[in-house]
Amino acid sequence: MTEITDRYFNDVIARLSGLRDRLAAQMEKAADLIAAAARADRRVYVFGTGHSHMMAEELHYRAGGLAITVPILCGSIMLQDGAVASSHFERIEGAVRPILDRYGIRDGDVLVVVSNSGVNAAPIEAARYAREKGAAIIALTSVAYSNTIARGRTQLLSLADVVLDNDAPSGDAVLEIAGSALKVGPVSTALGVTILNAVFADVAARLVGEGDALIYLSANMPGSGDINRLLVERYRDRNPHL
């Protein structure tokens, strides 16, 4: 392993170790909200723009994941239809409401809003939309980054029922390179995926203990066809991406 790859591993490991203790109470609160939604036959929606949308894809139809999860996916807020355009789109007031209208978010649901900076128009609008509909809001964001750049703007963390601080630094990248003023090695994705999968694992354990396993099995595992088919049939009505 080279010196810089070693530094990256060490940084991520150190941040995860710190998060495990510092976020324990907030992660438990997030699991409480999601478990309550599952018991009430509600859904957990996941929203993010740009690279943050990967959290929605990570939790959707995932081996070991929860079938109540619904990703909010639209080309205009993702990267594959134009990264520069998506960066512009997420800053336009009112742009994401028509996207959210397609999903039927309602009272008792949970919306996980992922935004590293936590100040762009899209995640703010998504959180406010969820509040209008009576859904609980879990924010996954970098508190340090958001506080640094807010400059009087509304912050996602101020709108959420639960805030999961991913501990990513301002600008996301953590590694300095000799001879350059720029940094490499963003950490928000690695940290965010770990936080959310840990929360969802907690929820799954609770539901299994209550006799209702809502867990997808990897498609290559024996018996996965029948298990996953039943879950898809049960939850397809409110998940357009199944």
Swiss-Prot record:
Pfam families: SIS_2. InterPro entries: RpiR-like_SIS (IPR035472), SIS_dom (IPR001347), SIS_dom_sf (IPR046348), SIS_GmhA/DiaA_subfam (IPR050099), UPF0309 (IPR022951). Disulfide bonds: none annotated. It comes from the Bacteria. CDD domains: SIS_RpiR. One of its GO terms (biological process) is carbohydrate derivative metabolic process. Residues 30-209 form the SIS domain. One of its GO terms (molecular function) is carbohydrate derivative binding. Belongs to the UPF0309 family. HAMAP family: UPF0309. This is UPF0309 protein BOV_A0853. It comes from Brucella ovis (strain ATCC 25840 / 63/290 / NCTC 10512).
